[in-house]
Amino acid sequence: MPPAIARFVAIAAVLLCGHVAVAAESGGVGGGSARRVLHQPLFPIEWTPPPSPPPPPAPDFTSDPSTPPAPDAPSGDFFPPAPPTTTTPTSPGTTPSPTTVAADVSKTPSGSGSGHHGGGPTKATIVAAGAGAAAAVALLGFACAFLITGRARRRGDSQKLLGPDRAGAHRSAATSAADFLYVGTVEPTTPARHHGPTTADLVGSPYRKLRSERARRGVSRDEDADHPSPELRPLPPLRRAATLGSSDEDGYYTPRQLSGGSGGGGAAEAWSSASASSPPTTTTASRRSLPSMTSDFFPPVAAIAAPPAPPPARSRRTPPRTRFSTGSTPDTKQVTSPSPRPVQPSNAPPPPPPPPPPPPPPPPPKLNTAPKPPPPPPPPPSVPSNNNLPKPAEPPAVPTSRRRLLKPLPPEGPRIAMPMPITAATTVDNNGSTSMREGDNAAADDGGSGEPRPKLKPLHWDKVRATSDRAMVWDQLKSSSFQLDEDMIEALFMNNSTPAAPPREVGRKAAGVPSFRQEERVLDPKKAQNIAILLRALNVTREEVSDALLDGNAECLGSELLETLVKMAPTKEEELKLRDYSGDLSKLGSAERFLKAVLDIPFAFKRVDAMLYRANFETEINYLRNSFETLEAACEDLRGSRLFLKLLEAVLRTGNRMNVGTNRGEAKAFKLDTLLKLADVKGTDGKTTLLHFVVQEIIRSEDAKSEKESAMISSSKDDRKHGLKVVSGLSSELGNVKKAATMDFDVLHGYVNKLETGLEKIKSVLQLEKKCTQGQRFFMSMQDFLKEAEREIERVRGEERRALGRVKDITEYFHGDTAKEEAHPLRIFMVVRDFLSTLDQVCREVGRMQQDRTVIGGSARSFRISATSSLPVLSLYGQRRENNSDDDSSSS
């Protein structure tokens, strides 16, 4: 039955009983005398009894039964005032009550007339009996209504706080500031059901003030229970402590799990203490209703740890203010989880007072004293969404049975606590060790705990400096978009510096073993490696090299091997170390062993230099001789070329013709540099240059000198081809000139000086013969070579002087006195080379022009016309033939 209907039925029953009592009293009065006449007034108007003090009220009634009960009486727990009884006066001097019907009826004239008939005591007895029966019926009805109402209210509270599946009992209550009380907070009304606080606790309870405030404001208790404030939903269940303490289903996940035999008060106090002493990541609910609730409903017990949150699968609805907040992400990690402790007795002695933070559990006060409300914790950093309830990490060896979970777990050994951020929740387990619970967003720093984080293996990368003037892909990343699993990454990539110590110790012990890499190293490691690579590439043994150095046989080794040996030459310090080494040669590397064998030969590397000079001497002498011979041949070719001389004549005549009337006219000679300018002077058509004209003139002159001149076209065609071939052959005729143009006389002179310097080194090596006791054949062979080398160098020197003289002569032959102004002695050959390359290009162009003319003339003459052709075609053919004949004659 709904509470409103129950209240309405109770009030109706009270009113009905009151009316029955009035009717019985009226009937009794009227029965003793005559019936009341209808014209007589109901209320007496002519007689007013004298005033008299009202009789004392009955022990079970406080007011008139016709008065409805006050809905907001400050005293009494949901019990409306009982219907009062009206004491019938024995004398007519009773003062009437203006608000009751029974008193008005008793003061009718019938009452006054009762004394005349002698029925006063009988009427009073009937009235008192009827009123008592009516009051008993009303009290019984109201008690039934109250029981029904209380049961419905308890069911509604359970539905609101626990949820349909008692999931609300597993929520962690939130704390709020202590200066605010929620309107409509329900306090226990059945002290017998759960052993609540004592009278002293209730006197100091703020809910007394709440009831007086509700009574003052006129707020109905049941109406407020039907429509609770939204702020009441995060509160934990308050009146199911006794049953939940022994419940096998919900005992582990409710805050009353740790309560003693006195109900759920101890667990609530522990929950309140943990909330007050923990950082703000434990809960995010209001901190104002919690202190008053814990002080009024639950007797204080020593707090152990904040109870773990229930699994999300058991909750159908998560209130918005009962979230655990661990940071900006919903994924919460439980580094160490608290273990449930056994039930604390109600008379447990208080522990010592709490030290400064990290906050330990507060000391539990005695049961007969009201606990002080804990200070409000700092506000949480953020409140996660309603749909993401964080899952606390379970201990590794926690049993799954809820009956076993209610039993105390064995004490857990101390764990290594990870560095915690400020938002980590600190709890204490059975052994007193501190356990931390951190969020994912706190894994990026040390958390201010001062403990260094475990070092992981490094990741070597190149960091890029962020620039503010351009947009980068890294600007799109958010700090909360991805979170790392700190435990997994530390387990996988821990930098094991301690296990790495034994290998280093083994390495130190192994250092005592002889090793050429550490103790027997003589050469630079890089140099030794290069020498070893060269030795493997040459595929030569130490014995072969030693024999060749002792005998002076350069042909046995070759110039490449000798050049490699020169590169292997050690420094003076390395040479001294290798010479003075008297240990085991097998302990040395391959490079050190090879150099040690070479250095055992007296003046080994000076011998190598002498043998390398001897091996390269013949090649260098031949190169110098060929170069000087080419210079002499170039001078002879340039002087004796008839076609080149004719070309110069054609250029001179053409230039004088073009320079008539100027200071440049009537020239008798010109520098060969002018030949490079012929291709720059272009004709009126924009294609033909002055060099084209000169080439065509030379071709025509060559055709004129042919022995047999004939009028046949074929003969003239062959003559024209012969003249073009003669001009084109000038480039091949002056081939030595082009070779000489690639030389540098200063370089050739430097080669000759180098040979003379090497010859001096050979002489210095031969002077060491007196100091050497072995390898005499080397000195004998070197003496023979020295005599021959001196003769060859003298010849080369003579050829050099002769070639240089020829070059000067040819320069004066073409340039006259201006040859002394030439800075480079071989420049004349370079000018002729460049002109010959341009001449070859012009000859190819002239040959294409002649070929085009021949094709056009031949196609016109081979054209045949049939006899049936018309005359205009014949006349056109004759005209075209005449034009072709004129062209041929003009070209010839």
Swiss-Prot record:
Residues 424-436 have a biased composition (Polar residues). Residues 446-867 form the FH2 domain. It is a single-pass membrane protein. Residues 87-111, 268-286, 297-306, 321-330 have a biased composition (Low complexity). Residues 1-23 form the signal peptide. Residues 210-230 have a biased composition (Basic and acidic residues). SMART domains: FH2 (SM00498). The chain crosses the membrane at residues 126-146. It is found in: Membrane. Gene3D superfamilies: Formin, FH2 domain (1.20.58.2220). One of its GO terms (biological process) is actin nucleation. Residues 43-119, 188-457 are annotated as: Disordered. Residues 47-59, 339-383 have a biased composition (Pro residues). Keywords: Membrane, Signal, Transmembrane, Transmembrane helix. GO terms for molecular function: actin filament binding. One of its GO terms (cellular component) is membrane. It holds the Pfam family FH2. Belongs to the formin-like family. Class-I subfamily. This is Formin-like protein 8. It comes from Oryza sativa subsp. japonica (Rice). The gene is FH8.
